[in-house]
Amino acid sequence: MLAPRGEARRKQLRTCALATGLGDKAVSLLYERVLRKERLELWIERCQAQISGVLDVLEKERAAVKTPYFFGERIGHADIAVACVLRFTGEAHAALFDAARYPALAAHSARCEALPPFAEIVQPLAPPSGD
């Protein structure tokens, strides 16, 4: 699901790193909003800016690709990582992942989530309550 070596592998790993970094920030933002009694607005703003920045980069890269998946005709690890983090980010922070602002990512997510393995294991977000 990843190229074995070379530039193709580095590009795929970069996309995976962007996706997992986005996930880290989305989780951090959720925790800050839900679990902390005294919210740090600076941290919230920083997380939101970083999330938006990564979404902008991924949107630009996905929009430039004319194949069904990021790196060709077959789904790869990067596609799965991006689709999963988009699901989480969209459920946890709907205002940050707007399909109108990120149409290529929204289409990518929909394409992946329409696949049987995604449909079989989908788990809607049940965030902590903070209690």
Please describe what each predicted stretch is.
Residues 70-95:
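GST superfamily/GST-like fold recognition
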Residues 126-131:
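Carbohydrate-binding/catalytic loop surfaces
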Residues 100-119:
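C-terminal end-helix/capping segment
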